Amino acid sequence: MSRRYFGTDGIRGRANGLITPELALKVGQAAGLVFQRGDHRHRVVIGKDTRLSGYMIENAMVAGFTSVGMDVLLVGPMPTPAVAMLTKSMRADLGVMISASHNMFEDNGIKLFGPLGFKLSDDVEKQIELLLDESLDKKLAASASLGRARRIDGVHDRYIEFAKRTLPRDLSLDGLRVVVDCANGAAYKVVPEALWELGADVISIGVEPDGFNINKECGSTAPEALCRKVREMRADIGIALDGDADRVIMVDERGHVVDGDQLLAVIAQSWKEDGRLAKPGVVATVMSNLGLERFLAAEGIDLVRTSVGDRYVLEQMMKGGYNVGGEASGHIILSDYNTTGDGFVAALQVLAVVQKLRRPVSEVCHRFDPLPQILKNVRYRNGRPLDDAGVQSAIHAGETRLNGHGRLLIRASGTEPVIRVMGEGEDRIMVEEVVDVIVDALGSASAAAA
């Protein structure tokens, strides 16, 4: 069965376009019906980021869940990993995060978590999709069985304490000047507070959300402001989260970006030395740089690759018994602590290494020289540009040219109408030329289909 609503990370699209109040209400009803298992009183935790449309979607989902008899616990703006953690901690049947992650404010989305805090399997999402296309009028709760909604206080402190407990009790961040960019998103309160409680000298940017400025020239997808601020304030390190704080990148004292691949290298090497790696392996995606794979191999650590998407990384981690995984984009999953990517907890593990080694971040966090990698996105409106004969010819020619010297990865995004073209190889000029030819072919195919 093809999926109409769910992509690789829940349901996502333009607010009041795809993501309407009607859809949000129906998702609440459908998910509520699927997760009403057993005879106990059922409840759902709902969190959100700071987008203007979050109010609209939140209220619609409350109506949907309560109409099928589920109680709703509202936690307000909170990081996605916090919602996953709270779902399990509060013994809820279901968790919801209203967010479009790193997208701009015009978009929004709905992420769902099961009672143990894990994202839903494909099979469960299909069950919900089937109900979305049905009339649910005859499945609504009786008047006396409707759900209630209440706002929960103190959830920020719960997540702060949870994050702090991932570090040794005797470890302090005293003496470390940290600039943190919260992307004007869900972490704008909790992360600066947690860093301060751990003893860091904290400088915060991206902590003034207005409903419109989430991810706007800030956060993990736009680290330029953080790089400047780190240099300006002579900070030791910078931390950039995205709008829902499930991904992180970092910046060294020179203002140079440290991506997810480098963070995986730091954590994996440190955890192996400390005997904390469950297995001598790390899970990453096909997008991770070959330099990471070579570095880990030299450390006696295997790199297991998956399709793009943190859900696939987690699935492989669970299947293979690994406890460290992630993506170059900054989704870092440490399954000893959480059930999904947690940007802040990952950052704390890196800060712990920095404090332990007492060396500059530029020495600690740049563990390998990445191979030149070019990534370009081609947006399209209609059709299937990857099936175009001209595009296929360009891809074949590129693969032939890079044979033995690099690799190509061309894929459609699972969350937006974009084709991602990635080339990697030892000769940067050759890689750029190959990628540009494919991008031009995709652009022509997209224009022809419009």
Swiss-Prot record:
Key words, A-Z: Isomerase, Magnesium, Metal-binding, Phosphoprotein
Keyword Isomerase: yes
Gene Ontology molecular function terms on file: magnesium ion binding; phosphoglucosamine mutase activity; phosphomannomutase activity
Residues of the active site: 101
PTM description: Activated by phosphorylation.
Coiled-coil annotated spans: none
Modified residues (Phosphoserine): 101
Entry annotated with the keyword Transferase: no
Annotated Gene3D superfamilies: Alpha-D-Glucose-1,6-Bisphosphate, subunit A, domain 3, Alpha-D-phosphohexomutase, C-terminal domain
GO cellular component, one term: cytosol
Gene Ontology terms: biological process: carbohydrate metabolic process; peptidoglycan biosynthetic process; UDP-N-acetylglucosamine biosynthetic process
Family the UniProt entry places it in: Belongs to the phosphohexose mutase family.
Protein name: Phosphoglucosamine mutase
Organism: Rhodopseudomonas palustris (strain BisB5)
Gene: glmM
